[in-house]
């Protein structure tokens, strides 16, 4: 693999990982709430 591909992809992957790390707890809470509502109905 060409090193230039890594230079281009690395910042994109870092940004995506940072976003997922910040969003994941809220997404998990929302899914759990949705599942609880579905179970209660």
Curated annotation (Swiss-Prot):
The modification N-formylmethionine is found at residue 1. One of its GO terms (molecular function) is manganese ion binding. The chain crosses the membrane at residues 5-23. InterPro entries: PSII_PsbY. It is a single-pass membrane protein. Residues 24-41 are cytoplasmic. GO terms for biological process: photosynthesis. It is found in: Cellular thylakoid membrane. The keyword Membrane applies. Residues 1-4 are lumenal. PSII binds multiple chlorophylls, carotenoids and specific lipids. Keywords: Formylation, Membrane, Photosynthesis, Photosystem II, Thylakoid, Transmembrane, Transmembrane helix. Pfam families: PsbY (PF06298). Disruption phenotype: No visible growth phenotype, PSII forms dimers, slightly reduced oxygen evolving activity in vitro. GO terms for cellular component: photosystem II; plasma membrane-derived thylakoid membrane. PSII is composed of 1 copy each of membrane proteins PsbA, PsbB, PsbC, PsbD, PsbE, PsbF, PsbH, PsbI, PsbJ, PsbK, PsbL, PsbM, PsbT, PsbX, PsbY, PsbZ, Psb30/Ycf12, peripheral proteins PsbO, CyanoQ (PsbQ), PsbU, PsbV and a large number of cofactors. It forms dimeric complexes. This protein is only loosely associated with PSII, and is not often found in crystals. Found on the exterior of the PSII dimer, near cytochrome b559 (psbE and psbF). Belongs to the PsbY family. Loosely associated component of the core of photosystem II, it is not always seen in crystals. PSII is a light-driven water plastoquinone oxidoreductase, using light energy to abstract electrons from H(2)O, generating a proton gradient subsequently used for ATP formation. HAMAP family: PSII_PsbY. This is Photosystem II reaction center protein Y.
């Amino acid at each position: 693999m060409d090193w230039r591909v890594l230079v281009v992809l690395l910042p994109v992957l870092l940004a995506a990982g940072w976003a997922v790390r910040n969003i994941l707890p809220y997404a998990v809470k929302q899914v759990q709430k949705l599942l609880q509502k579905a179970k209660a109905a």
